[in-house]
């Protein structure tokens, strides 16, 4: 057995996380120790004898040669939860968040989205928006995010640099689109392939394990066959993740059918071009057939559930229960700016509403619980990005990506009362909490400014 690294910091108090879906562990009187690499080396919970807890604190500090006053964080009546994982966000669209919600997907792209994304050829404009969106995500407790950038190589690299400076964990994708796009916002096939390869190489060369490239064909209608073949090959060669959109909107699905009449389904299009595998994240997936769900499960592809966007653009409601029963990796996505809110807490709430809506028409449907939704925002997301061995909860050996939540902060959006259990207070935070309750944020053990 390998010797554990030296512990440099201890967190003492209530810890809340999930190990399996549907079960939230609420662990009072807990003790977590992390090393200089931000890896959890010690985790013990539910001390019944508080004197023993304090003895263990003193012993760990002594054994590791650290000062108890400087190295122990007593959370008091606050609690610790894992960082949220946003599995689908369009960083440039943050400029439009909260506006342009009056149109369905394809018209929305044409009127609002492509015009703003085309502006990111201006690096001053890009730096302003990208700095703000990353800061906002962090303030809402998002420690890991899958970002779509734009078609612009330099601006996409700039987003990666901003993310790296802020200390966020992220996957950054230079968007690829070489057809069926506006004249002012489109690449040639050669440009898209060349710039994407260059982008991937540049990000990998930076050597930051927290910030990785992700191959990003926008969606099948905007990418030629030649481009999709090249992107599939690139992802295989570099072993990067892949992200795209699938079956978000019925008009989109009909469009794909007209483009690929000889291929069985929209999902099969991605498989045809080697873009559907265990490293792939498909956003939305609202209108999948049973055969497509089976294919996604077989391919070990992940789905990013984006309920705010699905509601806002009138795209439809994903049947989350059906996806979970098919043993598909599933996480949550804000989908800024189709989704108007950057907070994964809000996505959790809308995912529950979305699931409840299926019960209206099917009394046998089992709606999503808040415990299950919390799992999707943490462990579920970690599985989607293939980092469940590193993040998602507080198991020893994982990185310490965490939020300290203060339910009693001045001007908290909710109130707590005598006699309430820790579960009551946690549930209030899930339904009523916001960025005001975020006291501290850590990514791989580093305290993040927000």
Swiss-Prot record:
Q: Which reaction does it catalyse?
A: guanine + H2O + H(+) = xanthine + NH4(+)
Q: Where does substrate bind?
A: 90-93, 218-219, 245-248, 335
Q: What is this protein called?
A: Guanine deaminase
According to UniProt, this protein's pathway is:
Purine metabolism; guanine degradation; xanthine from guanine: step 1/1
Residue positions annotated to bind Zn(2+) are 88, 90, 245, 335
Question: InterPro entries, per this entry?
Answer: Amidohydro-rel (IPR006680), Guanine_deaminase (IPR014311), Metal-dep_hydrolase_composite (IPR011059), Metal_Hydrolase (IPR032466), Metallo-dep_hydrolases (IPR051607)
Gene3D superfamilies, alphabetized: Metal-dependent hydrolases, Urease, subunit C, domain 1
Q: Name one GO biological process term.
A: guanine catabolic process
A Gene Ontology cellular-component term:
cytosol
Function, as annotated? Catalyzes the hydrolytic deamination of guanine, producing xanthine and ammonia.
Family according to the record:
Belongs to the metallo-dependent hydrolases superfamily. ATZ/TRZ family.
Q: Which PANTHER family match?
A: GUANINE DEAMINASE
Name the EC number(s): 3.5.4.3
Q: Which organism is it from?
A: Dictyostelium discoideum (Social amoeba)
Name any one GO molecular function.
Answer: zinc ion binding
The EC class name is: hydrolase
């Amino acid at each position: 057995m390998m010797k554990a690294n030296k512990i440099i910091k201890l967190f003492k108090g209530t810890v809340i996380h999930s190990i399996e879906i549907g079960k939230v562990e609420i662990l009072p009187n807990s003790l977590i120790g992390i090393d200089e690499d931000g890896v959890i080396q010690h985790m013990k919970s539910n001390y019944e004898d508080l004197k023993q807890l304090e003895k263990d604190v003193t012993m760990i500090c002594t054994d590791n040669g650290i000062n108890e006053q400087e190295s122990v964080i007593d959370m008091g009546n606050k609690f610790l939860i894992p960082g949220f994982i946003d599995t689908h966000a369009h960083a440039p669209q943050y400029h439009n968040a909260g506006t342009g919600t009056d149109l369905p997907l394809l018209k929305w792209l044409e009127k609002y989205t492509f015009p703003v994304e085309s502006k990111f050829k201006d690096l001053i404009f890009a730096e302003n928006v990208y700095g703000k969106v990353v800061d906002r995500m962090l303030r809402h407790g998002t420690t890991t995010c899958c970002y779509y950038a734009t078609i612009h190589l330099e601006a996409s690299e700039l987003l990666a640099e901003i993310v790296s400076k802020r200390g966020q964990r992220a996957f950054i994708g230079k968007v690829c689109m070489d057809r069926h796009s506006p004249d002012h916002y489109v690449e040639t096939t050669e440009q898209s392939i060349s710039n994407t390869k260059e982008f991937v190489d540049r990000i990998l060369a930076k050597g930051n394990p927290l910030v990785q490239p992700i191959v990003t064909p926008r969606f099948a209608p905007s990418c030629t066959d030649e481009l999709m073949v090249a992107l599939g090959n690139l992802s295989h060669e570099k072993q990067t993740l892949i992200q795209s959109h699938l079956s978000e909107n019925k008009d989109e699905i009909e469009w794909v059918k007209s483009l690929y009449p000889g291929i069985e389904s929209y999902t099969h299009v991605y498989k045809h071009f080697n873009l559907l595998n265990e490293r792939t994240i498909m956003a939305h997936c609202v209108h999948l057939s049973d055969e497509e769900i089976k294919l996604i499960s077989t391919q070990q592809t992940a789905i990013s559930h984006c309920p705010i966007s699905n509601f806002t653009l009138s795209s439809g409601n994903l049947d989350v229960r059906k996806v979970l029963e098919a043993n598909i990796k599933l996480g949550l996505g804000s989908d800024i700016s189709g989704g108007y809110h950057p907070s994964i807490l809000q996505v959790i709430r809308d995912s529950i509403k979305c699931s409840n809506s299926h019960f209206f028409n099917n009394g046998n449907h089992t709606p999503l619980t808040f415990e299950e939704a919390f799992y999707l925002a943490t462990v579920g997301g970690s599985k989607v990005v293939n980092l469940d061995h590193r993040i998602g909860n507080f198991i020893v050996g994982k990185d310490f990506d965490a939020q300290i939540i203060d339910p009693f902060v001045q001007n908290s959006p909710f109130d707590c009362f005598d006699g309430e259990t820790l579960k009551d207070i946690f549930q209030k935070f899930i339904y009523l909490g916001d960025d005001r309750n975020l006291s501290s944020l850590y990514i791989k053990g580093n305290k993040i400014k927000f």
